[in-house]
Curated annotation (Swiss-Prot):
Its EC number is 6.3.2.1. It is an enzyme of class 6 (ligase). The keyword Cytoplasm applies. Homodimer. Pathway: Cofactor biosynthesis; (R)-pantothenate biosynthesis; (R)-pantothenate from (R)-pantoate and beta-alanine: step 1/1. SUPFAM superfamilies: Nucleotidylyl transferase. It comes from Solidesulfovibrio magneticus (strain ATCC 700980 / DSM 13731 / RS-1). This is Pantothenate synthetase. Keywords: ATP-binding, Cytoplasm, Ligase, Nucleotide-binding, Pantothenate biosynthesis. It is found in: Cytoplasm. CDD domains: PanC. GO terms for molecular function: ATP binding; pantoate-beta-alanine ligase activity. Beta-alanine binds at residue 61. The reaction proceeds by a bi uni uni bi ping pong mechanism.
Length: 285
């Protein structure tokens, strides 16, 4: 596996792949990789002749007071995991290499970005779309793989990809969970022992919502109230940032539940904010 840090070197290599007609799979990450990232890399490996992964803690997707400086970093560890997952090229640029000092251009999808995470992180997805656009232009991927844990990001990037004509196949990789149901996240290492003990309750609350839909409940409000009660009882150290029932494509609120609906949440602990979701698609007939 080759590690590249300069965009110009990656651009030159990607040009060679294009001329050779090679299919390229791409997995963008912020590093501190775990088994969830590994699953995305293996998905890409199964769909392309060449696999590129990026490790870049993108400063433009962090807002004031967020955890940019505290976000865990370990490139040596990341390189070992990426190599084991079948990655051919690991791109690990610096912020200075990715952004000109006078950079003033942004890419955003405001209709989808205002919901869910965007309500409390208004500039987050602008940063995500901008850096992914830049990475797409460098890598020229045939297929790009993103985790479904950040469902909103996946929806936004699909829209951006279609609107800007990148022509990349966007694939969503299933959420990978710990044995107790907690969604894998690089930020989980920053939970206190007590918070880590309670954190699986996030997924349990969403599973409760999914079960209520399966049992015939159609009132989203009643379901969300039940999930809030579950969180109050089982995740008392967490503060709900949002808890919503939305259309999986438009991200608009769903009420009543008469079609597949996404239950999505973000919960804040002392030093970390965790997101999770479940798709309730198995509606009673």
């Amino acid at each position: 596996m080759e590690i590249i840090k300069e965009p110009s070197a990656l651009r030159e290599l990607a040009g060679q792949w294009t001329r050779q007609g090679r299919s390229v799979g791409f997995v963008p990450t912020m590093g501190y990789l775990h088994a969830g990232h590994e699953s995305l890399m293996r998905l890409a490996r199964g769909r392309a002749e060449t696999v590129v992964a990026s490790v870049f803690v993108n400063p433009t997707q962090f807002g004031p007071g967020e955890d940019l400086n505290a976000y865990p970093r370990d490139l040596e560890r990341d390189a070992a995991l990426a190599k084991a997952a079948g990655v051919d090229v690991l791109f690990a640029p610096s912020p200075e290499a990715m952004y000109e000092p006078a950079a003033a251009t942004w890419v955003e999808v405001p209709t989808l970005a205002r919901h869910l995470c965007g309500a409390s992180r208004p500039t987050h997805f602008r940063g995500v779309c901008t850096v992914v656009s830049k990475l797409f232009l460098l890598v020229r991927p045939t297929v790009a793989v993103f985790g479904q844990k950040d469902w909103q990001q996946l929806a936004i990037l699909r829209r951006m990809n279609a609107d800007l004509g990148f022509g990349v196949e966007i694939v969503g990789g299933p959420i990978v969970r710990e044995a107790d149901g907690l969604a894998l996240s690089s930020r989980n290492v920053r939970l206190t022992p007590q918070e880590r003990e309670q954190a699986p309750g996030i997924n349990q609350g969403l599973a409760l919502a999914e079960a209520m839909v399966r049992d015939g409940e159609t009132a989203a409000g009643r379901i969300l109230d039940a999930v809030r009660a579950h969180y109050a009882a089982h995740v008392p150290l967490g503060e709900i940032d949002y808890l919503s029932c939305v259309d999986p494509d438009s991200l608009e609120m769903v009420e009543p539940i008469d079609r597949p609906a996404l239950f999505a949440t973000a919960v804040r602990f002392s030093a970390v904010r965790l997101i999770d979701n479940r798709l309730a698609a198995d509606l009673p007939r």
